[in-house]
């Protein structure tokens, strides 16, 4: 399979079902922003020496491929075509368990903190903000297209997890949080 097709040279792209749309289409904006989040998780995963964190990030990247695939398929916006692209309520619960586990290792927040910390922590903070943008793009898409509510729930919970993982990575790397 070639990486270039020349079919997008005039500002259009193909969706999963073959439909051609503008690269500025809200659906493309939504799954494109999910892809940006995924790329940032890749940067964090390759930057950390923490094997547990790297494994978590790789699992999240796989999830984001499923989210992107479902968003790129207008005929299956609510029900995914393939099992591989299906997220479940159980997966959201797993993210919540990861949040709880990470928070148990962290001091309670009493005020806002500045994004930053260690290099990995800073990348995870950036991933969190891009994830929030993905969520906003997905919510915007719901004005014109069907989007599975679970996808929005998943992305919302993911951004919470990324915040906690950013704090955890920075703490494990010996960096102090800077209060606002």
Question: Model segments located where?
Answer:
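Phosphate/pyrophosphate-binding loop motifs in nucleotide- or prenyl diphosphate-using proteins
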Residues: 1-180
């Amino acid at each position: 399979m070639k990486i270039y097709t020349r079919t997008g040279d005039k500002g259009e792209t193909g969706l999963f079902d073959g439909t051609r749309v503008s690269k500025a289409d809200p659906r493309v904006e939504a799954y494109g922003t999910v892809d940006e989040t995924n790329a940032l998780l890749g940067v964090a995963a390759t930057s950390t020496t923490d094997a547990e964190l790297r494994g978590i990030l790789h699992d999240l990247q796989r999830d984001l491929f499923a989210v992107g695939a479902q968003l790129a398929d207008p005929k299956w916006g609510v029900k995914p075509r393939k099992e591989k692209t299906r997220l479940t309520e159980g997966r959201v619960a797993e993210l919540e368990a990861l949040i709880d586990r990470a928070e148990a290792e962290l001091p309670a927040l009493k005020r806002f903190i500045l994004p930053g910390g260690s290099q990995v922590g800073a990348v995870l903070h950036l991933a969190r903000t891009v994830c929030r943008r993905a969520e906003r793009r997905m919510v915007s898409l719901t004005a014109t297209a069907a989007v599975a509510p679970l996808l929005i729930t998943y992305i919302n919970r993911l951004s919470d997890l990324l915040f906690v993982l950013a704090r955890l990575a920075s703490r494990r790397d010996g960096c102090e949080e800077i209060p606002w």
